[in-house]
Amino acid sequence: MNASVRIGARSLLAHRRRLLGTVASIVLGVAFLTGTMVLGDTLRANFDTLFADANAGTGAVVRSAEVLDAPNVPGGVRAPLDDALTAKLRAVPGVSAAEPSVQGAGQLIGADGTPIGGQGPPTLAGNWINDSQLNPYRLAEGRAPAAPGEVVVNRGAARTGGLHLGSTTVLRTPDPVRVTVVGIATFGADADGMGPSTFTALTLADAQAHLTPRGSGQVSTVRLRSDTLSQRQLVERVRPLLPDGVEALTGADATAQSTADVSGRFLGLFTTLLLVFAGIALLVATFTIHNTFAIVTAQRTRENALLRALGASRGQVLGTTLGEALALGALASGLGLLGGFGVAAGLKALFAAIGFTLPTGGTVVHTATIVLPLLTGTVVAVGSALAPALRAARTAPLAALRETAVDGAAEGRGAWLRAGLGALLVFGGLPATVVGATRGPSLTLTVGGALAVLAGTVVLGPVAAALAVRTLGAPLPRLRGVTGALARRNAARNPKRTAATATALMVGVAVVTLFTVFGASVKATLDDSVSRSFAGDLAVTAPATGAGGSGVSPKLAPALSALPEVRAAVGLGRGVAQVDGHGRQLDVADPAALAQVVDLGRIDGSLDALGADGLAVSRAEAAARGWSLGSTVPMRFTDGPAAFTVRALYQGGGVAGDYLISRQAWQPHRVQDADTMVAVALRPGVTLSQGKAAVQRAADAYGSPKAQTRAEYAASSAGAVDMMLSVVYALLALAVLIALLGIANTLTLAVHERTRELGLLRAVGQTRGQLRAMVRWESVLVAAFGTTGGLALGAFLGWALTRAADSAGTGSFALPAGRLAVVLLVGLLAGALAGLRPAARAARLDILRAVAAD
């Protein structure tokens, strides 16, 4: 065996306890990366299997070729088909069965009166397809719907809503439909549903009556099968009979597109998000690993020098250290790979806990999922150890024999170079970030500048560490006497080491702070938007199509207007059209009435003049498109193109979006009527509580949408932000844990390094309790440096991101002092906890052995 390999192996075994923190850091980082990749592989395979099983009997799908991109609607919005096409296709030779399919939004009310779903995943409704081979759903209990008001619901929705055979409830389409559950179905062979979505199946007549606004003779698609033709032959057979604007595709192609629409976008965002957090965890681990090897290498200066004196070359010393890192990285990566399966299960449970149930199935692992984490963990370990290894290899033998633990503060030319490079990055990145956030704004320039500031902060860490720790620890001598003074001095004595240890925590805290500030700013923007633009007293809301629900019935606003407590009630609907090749969301309302409950700011032109072909546009959107009053705007709807004229410009940035048309204009193009909210203004003399009670009683007859005050409406609009922050905090906890392991590991190594010094302190009268307190306070100071630096950096980056993302210039910036104070306190407390084990080890040192230590 090579001498370098033998020496490296013996060194690892001899110092294995010192490297436990490093191993743990790599294990956690690699486990997160592996868990993310395993979960992604598994979900993709589960979605593929789920859809393939459900659609196995479908040979071809006929649908409209006209499709519009729609925000939050996977696959976009397609035009409906004439149901007469179904009979025509049934008559084609070789077609064994042809069944119409109607799809729309429909949200069930559970047994407890609360809506089922509606928190993101779609709530779907459609007709029950009688041909079992063409129906992706399979009856698990009961029977198919045969009479008006009878429905089949997917098993997951029934379980969530406490529904069973014979249950009577309401289906919001969005008009309320009284229904009775006669069947419970699985998606495919045994899935509770199509992922986390819900599905309610009605008779074809009911589905056409409630889900298609243009009459009962329309369907969404026609599904075909053949007992004699292949899928490709079936498509070729029916294609010549299809009218213009209608297409046919094989069942396999339709399944692949459905899988991509439902799972592709979601999984792409899902796995990318998780990989970002895995990257943050590995970045934090990099600082911990580098610091550990820097300390261990410095502590072994005499050992390495002796090897050099005995004839070892620089390359052999370098190879020994890197070999240790390679072995350590490979071992820890292997353990992390195994732990990744547990992380995948934990991530799945985390999302299930917030109501986002993922499809079940066997675990799937691709080769890349094994190789990439192993390589990543090993490369991170070796790369982090490279600089300490090079430093060890460059040490002259005779000089090294006269030194011990050489890893001092950044001094001399190296310190000046570090200071210069760090200053260049910070003072170059700061203006770029500010300009990108305030001029334009430019997200690319902002992110580039922010990364430069982050890199510069890391580089300047050793330069700033001593001053920062002395400043933060200034009260300690007065509060804790000599113990506090020694803790402060110990934390500042090696700025390079302190900075490297604190930087890991700083990165984690900075990201936590960034998301906290950004989330608070989004909530403040929503609150200001409602306060500024919502002039009503109450809002009646339900999740809309594309946001997980079916919206509010358009019949509700007229019903509320008839209440004696109500002065005005105006429904605000949503539509979609293609403008300049891109799908745009349209607000649909009675423009003149809308002005009574929504403040649109200064209006140029006239809302009363919109009519059947008029358009009102926000000023920001009009400026971006080069439009003015009188401009003609070509639009494309699912039923074809239409030209609109800009007849009004308004402020925008509030409850109303960028495009507003009248209900008269939307009538020919509508797909499924729904309002996202009804804004209500009360009559003078009616109290808020009286008005809310009256409005809620009336709304209960329309599927129980929720009546809210302005403050409640603003708070509910921001509810998704709190959910997002909860997930982010849970994911970032791993990075912060790795950073705290780094602090504990560094202090443990420092205790070993300062054994003789600690023994002398005990010999001159320091008690065990004082020694423990000294080490704990040193840990707190390092954590304070990392936490305060992370808070400052994260707050700045949060401000920059908030401004850069606010292209309309109507957003608000908020600095949540309470939450940031909690982050600070948690950081300090975590620092104290990280110091417990090193402090206990220091206190257990035998005085005589410690004093005699070399």
Where do the model's predicted regions map?
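Membrane transport/envelope proteins' first extracytoplasmic loop
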Residues: 1-283, 295-298, 315, 530-532, ...
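Alpha-helical transmembrane segments, especially those used as permease/efflux helices
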Residues: 2, 17-21, 25, 269-272, ...
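Short cytosolic juxtamembrane segments of multi-pass membrane proteins
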Residues: 2, 394-410, 843-854
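Interfacial "coupling" helices/loops that link adjacent transmembrane helices in transporter permeases
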Residues: 4, 11-18, 278, 285-329, ...
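Alpha-helical transmembrane segments
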Residues: 6, 18-19, 30-62, 67-68, ...
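Small-residue-rich transmembrane alpha-helices
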Residues: 293, 326-357, 369-394, 425-435, ...
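Juxtamembrane segments of multi-pass membrane proteins
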Residues: 451, 456-457, 463-621, 631, ...
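C-terminal transmembrane helical bundles of large multi-pass transporters
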Residues: 498, 675-681, 688-840, 844-854
